[in-house]
Amino acid sequence: MVRKLSKTRYGARAFDDRAGCYCVFEALRRLSRESAKLDYKVVSVATTQEEIGTRGALTAAYALDPQVGLAVDVDHATDFPTCDKRKFGSIKLGSGVVISRGPNINPKVFDRLVESAERENIPYQIGAESRPTGTDARVIQMARGGVATGLLGIPLRYMHTPSEVADLADIEGCVKLIASFAASLKNSDDFTF
């Protein structure tokens, strides 16, 4: 059951990771209007077992052998009183999609995501990952000879509970950013560093 909590906030179980699936598929729907203009093929995968070893992403990335991969997941919103922002960072519900930076993230993909967000006036937050993430990005970037990988997160309160809370503005921003990022890619892009 989905409950409306305010104008743009909703509570439900399993936003992790239904929200990410929605964002990817909606971005693909919007991109399909521009498919004649795209310089490459866009492929989407809804993976399984991300929470228990990222097995679905591992096999999918190996089979597809992409040049660029973008994992879309949720990120812990830390905007509640008992959360230590110094330890967990400051991610706010309703303040935009989270663009992660860290050891699994290709810096050129990160920069392109930020450029896309700024070009389209899409609100975003930066998530700092000090070690490999527990997301599909962790294994996508290691597939075959390596994949230039980015990670987007939808801020989510009360993750892994029956009462997760998400903001529709963050979800819409994620959709727009995926579509804008994908539309900006060219076959000639070099993501090596």
What feature does the model see in each segment?
Residues 7-51, 177-181:
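Alpha-helical metal-binding/catalytic segments enriched in His/Glu/Asp
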Residues 18-21, 52-56, 134-137, 161:
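Short glycine/serine/threonine-rich phosphate/pyrophosphate-binding segments
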Residues 1-4, 84-85, 148-153:
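Acidic-glycine-rich active-site phosphate/pyrophosphate-binding loop
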Residues 91-175, 180-193:
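Active-site-adjacent substrate-binding region
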Residues 66, 83-96:
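Active-site loop ensemble at the mouth of alpha/beta enzyme cores that anchors a bound cofactor
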Residues 60-79:
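A glycine-rich helix N-cap at a beta->alpha junction
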